[in-house]
Amino acid sequence: MGQEQFSDILNLLRLPKPRAVDIIPLFAQLEHDYPCNVENQIDDLTGVWELRWSSSNAPYLQVQPWLDNLQILLPADKRAVNLLKLPAPLGGIAVVAELQIQPPKRIGVTFIRGGWIGPKFGLFKPKLLTNIKQEFPAWLDVTVLTNELRLSRGSDGTLFALIKRHDLNTSELTSSLYL
């Protein structure tokens, strides 16, 4: 039954607009059947993840065909980047964070800086980043984790379903951010 549930949710997440009514039951069942221990799954956690579904109503947490909503996780470096890649030639919006692994499933998040990352012009890539003064503690519970799928719950109760993007390189996406 387990592999079928993973296949079902991955197939749903590859649809243009996955529906909550389809995702939530599988989300809950996988959380129950396959609990995560982040400390033992650092290799699975590391990499580029694409947000494919969220329970949030925030526009930047919705799946849009014109927007790549990526999260680059580098737990060995205690760093992460949330990256909204806008259509060319607009560049993207990035937020850099420091991570603190808190086993078994919690990751503490401290946002450091964020802003606009422009498109590349030859060797030059303009950016406008500013420091962030985080007023509240933030965290993410990684509840299910494989090398293909990550299910998480945010500190505000939001559910997130992400698929791993093996075709994207963490170094290329983060090189201009001076992590």
PLM features per residue range, with description:
Residues 2-179:
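Soluble ligand-binding/transfer domains with enclosed cavities or grooves
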